[in-house]
């Protein structure tokens, strides 16, 4: 959890925002997935947002659903994902690692056991995509018991009451949604969300990172100009994996070429 705080302090001193890529663990296979994550970090990723393959991903558009299918095809299990997380943490001791998941995966293990395992392998945050704030008590309580930041999604139409709850219960960062709907780079992020950012700050929420539809450096810059602490990009990155599925080296080069200008756009 503290890794996020340290990161945001460091970035503020350097007048930078955070660039956070999302990928599905085990896509397209364990070995290449670990290389992908190393490449993202080497190219400038400030934190990681990682998915555990799940059979019914509600918030995911087709690009990320396909990533899940590729990981399943490679036989990747949640247990192997935790082994991968331990390896990533060992190799990259300071980078914040967040999981983006669904409640069933948490329930499968037992809520407390799931967060205990997150703590053990060095996961900093967990966003449970299909659990709304008002139903989050058992998740966030278990998270805090195990020093894992509970992350909440702030939708573009959030009312004052929801903003207060997100500010009160969330830790690490706040996932600021560019727009409603499913993830996907083909739906570009909409208007700057200045009013939400202002309110979240007023209520002392964890720093907002804008996600959904972030696929170009100008959008990263716009998110930061609107007051966000950074931007999360998922589908655009997963698409690169898909496009180079049979060319592992080209894939890594293309990922590097995508991340570098996205990170550069966070520097004022």
Curated annotation (Swiss-Prot):
GO CC terms, sorted: cytosol
Keywords: Amino-acid biosynthesis, Aromatic amino acid biosynthesis, Lyase, Tryptophan biosynthesis
Positions of disulphide bridges: none
Reactions the enzyme catalyzes: (1S,2R)-1-C-(indol-3-yl)glycerol 3-phosphate + L-serine = D-glyceraldehyde 3-phosphate + L-tryptophan + H2O
Bilayer-crossing regions: none
SUPFAM superfamilies: Ribulose-phoshate binding barrel
Pathway(s): Amino-acid biosynthesis; L-tryptophan biosynthesis; L-tryptophan from chorismate: step 5/5
Its biological purpose: The alpha subunit is responsible for the aldol cleavage of indoleglycerol phosphate to indole and glyceraldehyde 3-phosphate.
Family: Belongs to the TrpA family.
Subunit (UniProt): Tetramer of two alpha and two beta chains.
NCBIfam families found in the cross-reference section: trpA
Protein's name according to its UniProt entry: Tryptophan synthase alpha chain
Organism: Escherichia coli O7:K1 (strain IAI39 / ExPEC)
Gene designation per UniProt: trpA
